[in-house]
Amino acid sequence: MKPHVVVGMSGGVDSSVTALLLLRQGYRVSGLFMKNWEEDDGTEYCTAAQDFADAKQVCERLGVELHTVNFAAEYWDEVFEVFLSEYRAGRTPNPDILCNKQIKFRAFLDYAEDLGADLIAMGHYARVAEEEGRLQLLKGCDPGKDQSYFLYTLQQEQLARTLFPLGGLRKTEVRALAAGAGFANDAKKDSTGICFIGERRFKDFLARYLPARPGDIRTPEGVLLGRHDGLMYYTLGQRSGLGIGGTRAGGQEPWYVLDKDLARNVLVVGQGHDHPLLYRDGLLASRLHWVDGAGPAPGEILRCAAKTRYRQSDQDCRIRLIGEDRLEVVFAQPQRAVTPGQSVVFYQDDCCLGGGVIDLTFNADSRADAA
């Protein structure tokens, strides 16, 4: 008898086709819908009811039992509190990565086991392969949808219990399968925004939880250009929302966020998408995780590729451990808008090696100080 697989059903097309494919492969399939956010009183941003209705329609069409679970408390404690603390410290976090680590592949897996699951499955565009007795996390075959960047914190035990049926497919193929199966969500828009919280006016949302500290907007030379509403609302390389136009000296070229001076509460801006101060030669990262459970040896210099944000092309680099949980990354070419709080994820060809959280960035002339 084929194993029992519990599929994370979100109401979207990816999880729906995941369940469809597993049924066609002969697995015994159940669905599990997660509700992880309860803070909004009204329905302004609420899509959970529609998502559940879509998941229910798909499961009924497939003849699959759909369970529901509320992980709102776990999400608040393990994901959202960390999200807020990172913004409070002036960094820009990636909650999707933490959500995968703490909710989708920990709390969900534990609950699925209580339902009698042998395996779980998710609609992520990624693959798992075995090499010399260890499991590898591989990129999805659709380069525009590959989600391995968000999955680098997965452990061997989690990979061994997880199926990614969409890893070898392109998004167009997934939508075609959904349409062929008669799913009403075959053309449903991909979810965006904060994991499980969704799309919303981010500035208004963040202000509900963190007090803003307005301050000056200045050029690197110290010229005062205006006022910002709070450093937490801005990220490196950002163009829109600055509220400043051209200057007599600088012309009408757009302004970009170059730095956030936390000590002085100053937003540093400059003109030009490729302003030199937006580029860094390297970074230091911590909170490291290696998919194979080992990673490079202390002192070893590993040449590989890295991404410092989702959908970035692979960037050649060399990495070395400089402490038990700290890593130095030096890029072959300077990188634009490398942002503390985001994750740097490492690859060799299609294989995701692991990654960590960016602590700070440096240029070659300041490397000694950074280390």
Curated annotation (Swiss-Prot):
- Which leading EC class covers this enzyme? transferase
Subcellular location(s): the record lists: Cytoplasm
What is the E.C. number? Answer: 2.8.1.13
Which UniProt keyword terms apply here?
ATP-binding, Cytoplasm, Disulfide bond, Nucleotide-binding, RNA-binding, Transferase, tRNA processing, tRNA-binding
UniProt xrefs under SUPFAM superfamilies: Adenine nucleotide alpha hydrolases-like (SSF52402)
Q: Where is this region: Interaction with tRNA?
A: 145-147, 309-310
Q: List the disulfide bonds.
A: 99-195
Q: Which HAMAP family match?
A: tRNA_thiouridyl_MnmA (MF_00144)
This chain's protein is named: tRNA-specific 2-thiouridylase MnmA
Q: Which organism is it from?
A: Methylococcus capsulatus (strain ATCC 33009 / NCIMB 11132 / Bath)
Q: What is the lineage of its organism?
A: Bacteria, Pseudomonadati, Pseudomonadota, Gammaproteobacteria, Methylococcales
Name of encoding gene: mnmA
